[in-house]
């Protein structure tokens, strides 16, 4: 089974992945789930948390990881993605890919014969969000009815947060500048999932105070995403500052609210030092949880 986006998962499946991640966090070593299995790790862009967490996850589950950076693999250059997928499927048992374009993942999944995991692309970041959900749960947050407020650019992280929130019955509010809203297809899918389960909600706004009011979780990401390299910083600095998570915005949330950021952070831009280093910040627990969530994802795809 592939994991390219979260919208193909049922609520029970998401909850089981989180439950397994909790187990792996408490029991880090001594597993052989991936014994005699080799996992290719394809990275088209530099990474700290994603690379470390997946590399360690594979090895700590008893498998072998094969790291392939851009420049070490053809992947559409000199060889079609389809042919690359076919060849790699003869060597490895699964492919974990952090790529620039979602279409690359779709092609790997279509033409390969082994499971493909989206470790990040321009449209979605499902593995990150599963780690986020673990972080919320271990901080006493019940998913159903939880208010999750996201601030900043409507990017891959916001897209996947909407889907996860819809699956679990959250009230998700996405606060972005106009014309920086999340991807329309992901909005549509989230609303369909909300209708399916009959609970939860999705609100898009350009007012960060509406998002912050009585929020249980405040979340932000960098203002210049991987799909926005052509944006000028002066444009960003003109329209994004009011979406910064700072003490004033945090004061409008619930007293026991937590703050998340998928990292790396541009301190002083999307989040202040005071908040990211403050008591309500769980960003480094969140980063650690990538390891445990990746293990749960690997377990899941080999069981389905």
UniProtKB/Swiss-Prot annotation:
Primary subcellular site in the record, as a coarse category: cytoplasm
Record-listed L-ornithine binding positions: 156, 221, 225-226
One GO process term, biological-process aspect: L-arginine biosynthetic process
This protein's record includes keyword Methyltransferase: no
InterPro entries noted in UniProt: Asp/Orn_carbamoyltranf_P-bd, Asp/Orn_carbamoylTrfase, Asp/Orn_carbamoylTrfase_sf, Asp_carbamoyltransf_Asp/Orn-bd, Orn/put_carbamltrans, OTCase_ArgI
Listed SUPFAM superfamilies: Aspartate/ornithine carbamoyltransferase (SSF53671)
Binding sites annotated in the UniProt record for carbamoyl phosphate: 47-50, 98, 125-128, 262-263, 290
GO cellular component, one term: cytoplasm
Keywords in alphabetical order: Amino-acid biosynthesis, Arginine biosynthesis, Cytoplasm, Transferase
First-level EC class: transferase
EC number of the protein: 2.1.3.3
Reaction catalysis annotation: carbamoyl phosphate + L-ornithine = L-citrulline + phosphate + H(+)
GO molecular function: amino acid binding; ornithine carbamoyltransferase activity
Biological or metabolic pathway of the protein: Amino-acid biosynthesis; L-arginine biosynthesis; L-arginine from L-ornithine and carbamoyl phosphate: step 1/3
Subcellular location: Cytoplasm
Pfam families for the chain: OTCace (PF00185), OTCace_N (PF02729)
General function of this protein: Reversibly catalyzes the transfer of the carbamoyl group from carbamoyl phosphate (CP) to the N(epsilon) atom of ornithine (ORN) to produce L-citrulline.
Family: Belongs to the aspartate/ornithine carbamoyltransferase superfamily. OTCase family.
Protein name: Ornithine carbamoyltransferase
